[in-house]
């Protein structure tokens, strides 16, 4: 996700926001072709079907001229100085926006600076992670059982966060950073994903592509830009996209879960047998676990003990993955312009969350070292991050989770444009962008 600094400022003024057009940088810029970050809606989420990035610009520019009142431009800064990056960081809700990584730096160059210790697997630390997740999830279920109705949202928030830790454990297993025994990793990963009704092997296969093609237009299996031709395809589709990227965006990972993991046609022939085993495990859990829950506590109990924590998990799944790689200055590039080192270092965001979230989710937010090498266990990510800050810190994007950061992502990072990175929905279809207008007015603009 190589990035360059957009040649403009995104101005926040109370509840209203403006994203000016970004003039094209000089050809000498290390990042010539910025991309965009967004997620496709419903089955279009995360590359439901292929689009052609080269055809994106024309339909976008066709609609911009009639909505000048929606996005008033401001004077574009140089964008090359530390002062300009600091201004952009402040306006986007970041602590730091990194400098352009030189073109001649490779991913191996960065990896070679990491201490060897960060790659070491420690069975006791891995077991500690499992105990933290099992204990916190059990505590969450107890809280749900004992809480009066008005405290249930807090119990659900805790339990949804705790069960996200199960996903991170399975995530380590998929990257072969949990145990030196592959069979143990497959068993633990499958079991950890079961309460989430997430098929382990299908997710593993697709997630490997995310790491191999991070922020590559079309090919990345994580959040993809909204292609302009799809945004323009029909009024119904446009409204669905706007709503999906509006109020329900923090749960849009549910669409990714449905779209990517249950269709055997999406997998290679060599993968299908393992995919079938994972699907059988998930369906068995649903066939046995769900009726058992209903038998014990009824349909409302199923909603109370399983569905609401599951929605809490998907809030974090969507939020973490959005924040990891989404910002107005982070490009999404076509394959012929993509650079691995820039994508993994410049295009990944380190974001600090409240400590209890980081503990329950096993430091999944410490994401830059994970993209330098997925083989780093979650319990070594902080040591690896410190090393990266010492050696490559000026190139990194740093943030603390805040309202302005989320407001930027949810109200600005929408439609792909090669020149501007993102074009917000309300610049293209202001009359249909009421959900975005609502978010601009309703979401606070705080950074603290």
Swiss-Prot record:
<keyword id="KW-0560">Oxidoreductase</keyword>
<dbReference type="GO" id="GO:0009706">
    <property type="term" value="C:chloroplast inner membrane"/>
</dbReference>
<feature type="short sequence motif" description="Histidine box-2">
    <location>
        <begin position="207"/>
        <end position="211"/>
    </location>
</feature>
<feature type="transit peptide" description="Chloroplast">
    <location>
        <begin position="1"/>
        <end position="69"/>
    </location>
</feature>
<dbReference type="GO" id="GO:0102850">
    <property type="term" value="F:acyl-lipid (n+3)-(Z)-desaturase (ferredoxin) activity"/>
</dbReference>
<dbReference type="InterPro" id="IPR005804">
    <property type="entry name" value="FA_desaturase_dom"/>
</dbReference>
<comment type="function">
    <text>Chloroplast omega-6 fatty acid desaturase introduces the second double bond in the biosynthesis of 16:3 and 18:3 fatty acids, important constituents of plant membranes. It is thought to use ferredoxin as an electron donor and to act on fatty acids esterified to galactolipids, sulfolipids and phosphatidylglycerol.</text>
</comment>
<keyword id="KW-1001">Plastid inner membrane</keyword>
<keyword id="KW-0812">Transmembrane</keyword>
<feature type="transmembrane region" description="Helical">
    <location>
        <begin position="124"/>
        <end position="144"/>
    </location>
</feature>
<dbReference type="GO" id="GO:0010205">
    <property type="term" value="P:photoinhibition"/>
</dbReference>
<feature type="transmembrane region" description="Helical">
    <location>
        <begin position="282"/>
        <end position="302"/>
    </location>
</feature>
<keyword id="KW-0809">Transit peptide</keyword>
<dbReference type="Pfam" id="PF00487">
    <property type="entry name" value="FA_desaturase"/>
</dbReference>
<dbReference type="InterPro" id="IPR012171">
    <property type="entry name" value="Fatty_acid_desaturase"/>
</dbReference>
<keyword id="KW-0275">Fatty acid biosynthesis</keyword>
<keyword id="KW-1133">Transmembrane helix</keyword>
<keyword id="KW-0150">Chloroplast</keyword>
<protein>
    <recommendedName>
        <fullName>Omega-6 fatty acid desaturase, chloroplastic</fullName>
        <ecNumber>1.14.19.23</ecNumber>
    </recommendedName>
</protein>
<dbReference type="GO" id="GO:0005886">
    <property type="term" value="C:plasma membrane"/>
</dbReference>
<dbReference type="GO" id="GO:0009507">
    <property type="term" value="C:chloroplast"/>
</dbReference>
<keyword id="KW-0934">Plastid</keyword>
<feature type="transmembrane region" description="Helical">
    <location>
        <begin position="149"/>
        <end position="169"/>
    </location>
</feature>
<feature type="transmembrane region" description="Helical">
    <location>
        <begin position="303"/>
        <end position="323"/>
    </location>
</feature>
<comment type="similarity">
    <text>Belongs to the fatty acid desaturase type 1 family.</text>
</comment>
<dbReference type="GO" id="GO:0006636">
    <property type="term" value="P:unsaturated fatty acid biosynthetic process"/>
</dbReference>
<dbReference type="GO" id="GO:0009941">
    <property type="term" value="C:chloroplast envelope"/>
</dbReference>
<feature type="short sequence motif" description="Histidine box-1">
    <location>
        <begin position="171"/>
        <end position="175"/>
    </location>
</feature>
<keyword id="KW-0443">Lipid metabolism</keyword>
<feature type="modified residue" description="N-acetylvaline">
    <location>
        <position position="70"/>
    </location>
</feature>
<keyword id="KW-0007">Acetylation</keyword>
<dbReference type="GO" id="GO:0006633">
    <property type="term" value="P:fatty acid biosynthetic process"/>
</dbReference>
<feature type="short sequence motif" description="Histidine box-3">
    <location>
        <begin position="367"/>
        <end position="371"/>
    </location>
</feature>
<comment type="pathway">
    <text>Lipid metabolism; polyunsaturated fatty acid biosynthesis.</text>
</comment>
<keyword id="KW-0444">Lipid biosynthesis</keyword>
<keyword id="KW-0276">Fatty acid metabolism</keyword>
<dbReference type="GO" id="GO:0019904">
    <property type="term" value="F:protein domain specific binding"/>
</dbReference>
<keyword id="KW-0472">Membrane</keyword>
């Amino acid at each position: 996700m190589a990035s360059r600094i957009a040649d403009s400022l995104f101005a926040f003024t109370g509840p209203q926001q403006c994203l000016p057009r970004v003039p094209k940088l000089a050809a000498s810029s290390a990042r010539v072709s910025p991309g965009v970050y967004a997620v496709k809606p419903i089955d279009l989420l995360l590359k439901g079907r292929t689009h052609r990035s080269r055809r994106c610009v024309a339909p976008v520019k066709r609609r911009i001229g009639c909505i000048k009142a929606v996005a008033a431009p401001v004077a574009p800064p140089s964008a090359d100085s530390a002062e300009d990056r600091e201004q952009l960081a402040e306006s986007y809700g970041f602590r730091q926006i990194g400098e352009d990584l030189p073109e001649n730096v490779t991913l191996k160059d960065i990896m070679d600076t990491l201490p060897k210790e960060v790659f070491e697997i420690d069975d006791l630390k891995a077991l500690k992670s499992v105990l933290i997740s099992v204990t916190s999830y059990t505590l969450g279920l107890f809280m749900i059982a004992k809480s009066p109705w008005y405290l249930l949202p807090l119990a659900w928030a805790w339990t949804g966060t705790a069960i996200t830790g199960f996903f991170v454990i399975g995530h380590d297993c998929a990257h072969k950073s949990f145990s030196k025994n592959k069979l143990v990793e497959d068993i633990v990963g499958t079991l950890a994903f079961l309460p989430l009704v997430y098929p382990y092997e299908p997710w593993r296969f697709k997630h490997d592509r995310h790491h191999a093609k991070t922020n590559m237009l079309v090919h990345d299996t994580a959040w993809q830009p909204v292609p302009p031709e799809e945004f323009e395809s029909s009024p119904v589709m446009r409204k669905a996209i706007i709503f999906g990227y509006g109020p329900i965006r923090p749960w849009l990972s549910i669409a990714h879960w449905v779209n990517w993991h249950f269709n055997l046609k999406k997998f290679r022939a060599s993968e299908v047998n393992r995919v079938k085993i994972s699907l059988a495990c998930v369906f068995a859990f649903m066939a046995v676990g769900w009726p058992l829950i209903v038998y014990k506590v009824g349909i409302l109990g199923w909603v109370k003990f399983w569905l609401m924590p599951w929605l809490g998990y998907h809030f974090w799944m969507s939020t973490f993955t959005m924040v990891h790689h989404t910002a107005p200055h982070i490009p999404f590039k076509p394959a012929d312009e993509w650079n691995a080192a820039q994508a993994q270092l410049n295009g990944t965001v380190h974001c600090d969350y409240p400590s209890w979230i980081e503990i329950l989710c096993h430091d999944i937010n410490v994401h830059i070292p994970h993209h330098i090498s997925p083989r780093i266990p979650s319990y070594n990510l902080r040591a690896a991050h410190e090393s990266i800050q010492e050696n490559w810190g000026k190139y990194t994007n740093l943030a603390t989770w805040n309202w302005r950061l989320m407001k930027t992502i949810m109200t600005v990072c929408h439609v792909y444009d090669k020149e501007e990175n993102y074009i917000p929905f309300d610049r293209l279809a202001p009359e249909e962008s009421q959900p975005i207008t609502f978010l601009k007015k309703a979401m606070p603009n705080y950074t603290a």
